[in-house]
Swiss-Prot record:
This is Malate dehydrogenase. SUPFAM superfamilies: LDH C-terminal domain-like, NAD(P)-binding Rossmann-fold domains. Catalyzes the reversible oxidation of malate to oxaloacetate. Coiled coil: none annotated. The lineage of its organism: Bacteria, Pseudomonadati, Pseudomonadota, Gammaproteobacteria, Methylococcales. NAD(+) binds at G11, A12, A13, G14, Q15, I16, A17, N105, Q112, V129, G130, N131.
């Protein structure tokens, strides 16, 4: 049997984790022949819930799940971790301003960044899902100076999947026939879902859809999808977020298809004029576990304005937590 992959999950007593952990345990992340060790982290007050989740994981009797560890100590959970899902974050409460939310989560992610720096594998792949994900990832990265910036990412794969599904439904085709969708920027309503490079059955997507539908329906629908789910379901996206997290990490480990890319929040290298070091969603290709930002995509004035809008929001968020960077 192969050497098991150490997978750490924060916020492991939460709803996204509940939709994620069992799929990892049965091979949906690394495939049917790769064993895993699951290392689960949550706050001490969630200890009983976490123990119950561990019991259920045991009861699945998955031959791939070699070991389960439960702890409230980040250093212990991150020790030797090769894949980290950072799901845990403080949700926005009544009367809480964005600055307040950023500050509360900044404290969490700075501490966890230091723990990752001390104990995680030097080749670790870290996915931040807990919101505000882009800036939380930036905080964790800056507090882990001994890890390469490329070890850190944040999730816009859910937005990418939402955009892909919406375009497929509109065009009456299967999602497998959609390629080259891009989500630029922040995981927030300022994100830019871009179809200028997308393909539907190999044809340019914008040649098949009404420009007014693209601007007036497609873009705001993707931007506001999370809020729409909350309004109808009464709770935030959990199963779809877990699925997107699996997709993101699977692509990172196993690579992207030929002639296609995925959307992934990574540290900007200055591509497309985005401020260096900002955690920003770009189209990326992945090979041998390493991502590369897709270069030289033409951007019209409309697209450049949208990129600038979401970049400004991220710069504002960064300024609010600058004392922790």
């Amino acid at each position: 049997m192969k050497t098991p992959v150490h997978v750490a999950v924060t916020g492991a007593a939460g709803q996204i984790a509940y939709s994620l952990l069992f799929r990892i345990a049965v091979g949906d992340l690394f495939g049917p022949h790769q064993p895993v060790i699951l290392k689960l982290l949550d706050v001490p007050s969630a200890e009983r819930v976490l123990e119950g989740v561990a019991m259920e994981l045991d009861d699945c009797a998955s031959p791939l799940l070699q070991e389960i560890e439960v702890s409230s100590d980040p250093a212990e959970v991150f020790d030797g971790a090769e894949a980290v899902f950072m799901l845990g974050a403080t949700p926005r409460g009544p009367g809480m301003e964005r600055r307040d939310l950023l500050q509360v989560n900044a404290d969490i992610f700075s501490a966890q960044g230091r723990a990752l720096n001390e104990s995680a594998s030097r080749r670790v792949k870290i996915l931040v899902v807990g919101n505000p994900a882009n800036t939380n990832a930036l905080i964790a990265q800056r507090n882990a100076p001994d890890l390469a910036p490329g070890c850190f990412s944040a999730m816009t794969r859910l937005d990418h999947n939402r955009a892909t599904s919406l375009l497929a439904r509109h065009c009456g085709c299967n999602v497998a026939e959609i390629s080259r969708v891009v989500i630029w920027g922040n995981h927030s309503p300022t994100q830019y879902p871009d179809l200028h490079h997308a393909r539907v059955k190999g044809k340019p997507a914008l040649s098949l859809v009404d420009p007014a539908w693209y601007v007036e329906t497609f873009i705001p629908t993707v931007q506001q999808r999370g809020a729409s789910v909350i309004a109808i379901r009464g709770k935030s996206s959990a199963a779809s977020a877990a699925n997107a997290a699996l997709d993101h990490m699977r692509s990172w480990f196993l690579g992207t298809p030929k002639d296609d890319w995925v959307s992934m929040t990574v540290s900007s290298d200055g591509s497309y004029g985005i401020a260096e070091g900002l955690m920003f969603s770009f189209p990326v290709t992945i090979e041998n576990g390493r991502f590369r930002i897709v270069q030289d995509l033409p951007l019209d004035t409309f697209s450049r304005e949208r990129l600038r809008l979401t970049e400004v929001e991220l710069l504002e968020e960064r300024a609010m937590v600058s004392h922790l960077l």
